[in-house]
């Protein structure tokens, strides 16, 4: 048989993992459901959210990552463009963030008696997971008068996070006799400990 509003009176969470408004057209919108269950949490996980020019665009996989700037086409030796090997970020990050939000909303509903409507865009999830590069890009857009380095680096202007650290020495991977080691002493306290440990306080 069909699904009725009464089927949702004891539900904690309803997840709409389709184009926004699909359940609404079936008479099962958040507004409909909360009439029979005020504590219900309605989580809509879509590609590009519920507003904007891409609201109803069907897509999946790497499409969210290209929208967020996480992946770009590559060229082969003949100059032909192709999509490089890339782990899909948005289609995993979006639902994961939705699960966190839904569980938090359930805890709130049990305390307050009020449900919640949650909107999750998988493209937004991809952009969130790529915050290192985004923040680094924005850092270089700041006025030169704004210092982005620190005293130990002579206040040298540089991007944040791990982006742009190819020439860095305090946050770097090094090849060793038996493999590789990841050296992470970007913070002042850790760099000081390292300098003391190797007897080179002149580098601090």
Describe every region a protein language model picked out.
Residues 1-114:
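N-terminal helix-loop segment corresponding to the beta1-alpha1 unit
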Residues 44-45, 122, 183-184:
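Short beta-strand segments
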Residues 63, 88-103, 121-133, 186, ...:
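Mid-domain beta-loop-alpha active-site segment that forms a flexible
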Residues 82-93, 115-117, 161-165, 169, ...:
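A short glycine-threonine-serine/GTX helix/turn-capping micro-motif
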Residues 95-116, 132-142, 195-202:
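Oxidoreductase and adenylate-handling cofactor-binding alpha/beta cores
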Residues 122-153:
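Helical "substrate-binding/catalytic lid" subdomain
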Residues 164-165, 169-204:
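Aromatic-enriched alpha-helical interface/lid elements that frame and gate functional surfaces
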